[in-house]
Amino acid sequence: MENTNIVKATFDTETLEGQIKIFNAQTGGGQSFKNLPDGTIIEATAIAQYKQVSDTYGDAKEETVTTIFAADGSLYSAISKTVAEAASDLIDLVTRHKLETFKVKVVQGTSSKGNVFFSLQLSL
């Protein structure tokens, strides 16, 4: 099963286990970051990013979905440019240091225009 919409992951997406993780992320999605209180810390075992096409009011656009896999089996997902940028760097760091578990803090902010946005921090 070749999945060409995978952007990046902290695990091997070519193995059966990796493909199951991606399948679950794409079909289940998990809990949205929008439903998490600001400052929520997720005990994570993996992160993946993939592309999906969203159709909003007849305007199809490609977006990056970021999914965090928690140690308890839960999934947390977001479609957010700021999350995607932070997660991309986080995936590099986790992969480089071969971290098996790590704590991700979901940070909520408000732009000068009043829009809510999310980002990620690595928590110690």
Curated annotation (Swiss-Prot):
What name does UniProt use for this protein?
Answer: Single-stranded DNA-binding protein
What gene name does this entry carry? 5
Q: How does it assemble?
A: Monomer.
GO biological-process terms attached to the record = DNA replication; viral DNA genome replication
Q: Which organism is it from?
A: Bacillus phage PZA (Bacteriophage PZA)
Keyword terms, alphabetized: DNA replication, DNA-binding, Early protein, Viral DNA replication
Give the family from UniProt. Answer: Belongs to the phi29likevirus single-strand-binding protein family.
What is known about what this protein does? Answer: Single-stranded DNA binding protein required for the elongation during viral DNA replication by strand displacement. Displaced viral DNA strands are transiently coated with the ssDNA-binding protein and therefore protected againt nucleases. The latter is then probably removed by the replisome that performs lagging strand synthesis or during the events that lead up to the recombination process. Has helix-destabilizing activity since it removes secondary structure from the ssDNA in replicative intermediates.
Q: Which GO terms describe its molecular function?
A: DNA binding
